[in-house]
Amino acid sequence: MAQIRIHEENTRIENEVEVSNFLQGEDVLYEKWNISKLPTHLKENYSLTDENKAEILTLFSKEIADVSERRGYKAYDVVSLSNSTPNLDELLINFQKEHHHTDDEVRFIVSGHGIFAIEGKDGRFFDVELEPGDLISVPENARHYFTLQDDRQVVAIRIFVTTEGWVPIY
């Protein structure tokens, strides 16, 4: 279950209903998908082959199709980041630059953890700490950035409005 941390106050929201209500109030789509169908060989596997990535997409194809139909998404892929990722520190520096997109930024966490820091409607930033099974859609034009949690590893399905993917606007 995702958790929220409000930067300015350093307060946390950890209750499932309160997290869902908070995100809904910020126009952030949040869903919990069933991660238990992930087979053992893909759990906590951060060195994925193309076949592994295709298997992950197949496992969650119904959920991807459902959210895509509801929200107009057109493309998707799987990304894996860990300490074995070449230039991970450089990638994280780039990810941590505050930006926005002209379309939604959607991620479903398969393994590991990630954090989206999002500027709320009141101008204050909050973190959405994500774990396996969490799907988030950061709304278009919302200022945000992404980083990893202390374990520095994540496998995520990225879902896009266009086949070109997101274009960051700094």
UniProtKB/Swiss-Prot annotation:
Molecular function per GO: acireductone dioxygenase (Ni2+-requiring) activity; acireductone dioxygenase [iron(II)-requiring] activity; iron ion binding; nickel cation binding
UniProt binding sites for Fe(2+): 99, 101, 105, 144
UniProt keyword annotations, A-Z: Amino-acid biosynthesis, Dioxygenase, Iron, Metal-binding, Methionine biosynthesis, Nickel, Oxidoreductase
Annotated binding of Ni(2+), by residue: 99, 101, 105, 144
Keyword Iron: yes
Any one Gene Ontology BP term: L-methionine salvage from methylthioadenosine
Positions marked as site (May play a role in transmitting local conformational changes): 104
Cofactor binding note of this UniProt entry: Binds 1 Fe(2+) cation per monomer. Binds 1 nickel ion per monomer.
Site (May play a role in metal incorporation in vivo): 98
EC number: 1.13.11.54, 1.13.11.53
Site residues, Important to generate the dianion: 107
Domain of life: Bacteria
Required cofactor(s): Fe(2+); Ni(2+)
Reactions it catalyzes: 1,2-dihydroxy-5-(methylsulfanyl)pent-1-en-3-one + O2 = 3-(methylsulfanyl)propanoate + CO + formate + 2 H(+); 1,2-dihydroxy-5-(methylsulfanyl)pent-1-en-3-one + O2 = 4-methylsulfanyl-2-oxobutanoate + formate + 2 H(+)
Pathway named in the protein's UniProt entry: Amino-acid biosynthesis; L-methionine biosynthesis via salvage pathway; L-methionine from S-methyl-5-thio-alpha-D-ribose 1-phosphate: step 5/6
Presence of the UniProt keyword Zinc in the record: no
PANTHER family, per database record: ACIREDUCTONE DIOXYGENASE
Family under the similarity heading: Belongs to the acireductone dioxygenase (ARD) family.
Subunit structure comment from the entry: Monomer.
Function of the protein: Catalyzes 2 different reactions between oxygen and the acireductone 1,2-dihydroxy-3-keto-5-methylthiopentene (DHK-MTPene) depending upon the metal bound in the active site. Fe-containing acireductone dioxygenase (Fe-ARD) produces formate and 2-keto-4-methylthiobutyrate (KMTB), the alpha-ketoacid precursor of methionine in the methionine recycle pathway. Ni-containing acireductone dioxygenase (Ni-ARD) produces methylthiopropionate, carbon monoxide and formate, and does not lie on the methionine recycle pathway.
Name of the molecule in the record: Acireductone dioxygenase
